[in-house]
C-alpha cells in the first residue's frame, strides 16, 4: 500500500521487452504492445531514422 522506494523493487519481476516478431530484436514492449526498434504494433512501416546511423566522412554507415 505504499508508492515509494519499497514498491520500486517489485518492478524487476516481469519482463518488459520480449523478442519482436518482425525484426527479431529483444525490443517488443509487452505492456505497450509495440516494438521500440522497428515500430511493430504501432505502424505498418518499419521505424527508421537517419540519426540512428553514425556518419563518418559525410557518408552514412548503415
From Swiss-Prot:
Its cofactor is Zn(2+). Binds 1 zinc ion per subunit. GO terms for molecular function: rRNA binding; structural constituent of ribosome; zinc ion binding. Pfam families: Ribosomal_L37e (PF01907). PROSITE patterns: RIBOSOMAL_L37E. InterPro entries: Ribosomal_eL37, Ribosomal_eL37/eL43, Ribosomal_eL37_CS, Ribosomal_zn-bd. It comes from the Archaea. Keywords: Metal-binding, Ribonucleoprotein, Ribosomal protein, RNA-binding, rRNA-binding, Zinc, Zinc-finger. A zinc finger (C4-type) spans 20-38. The keyword Oxidoreductase does not apply. Zn(2+) binds at residues 20, 23, 35, 38. GO terms for cellular component: cytosolic large ribosomal subunit. One of its GO terms (biological process) is translation. Belongs to the eukaryotic ribosomal protein eL37 family. NCBIfam families: PRK04179.1. Binds to the 23S rRNA. This is Large ribosomal subunit protein eL37. It comes from Desulfurococcus amylolyticus (strain DSM 18924 / JCM 16383 / VKM B-2413 / 1221n).
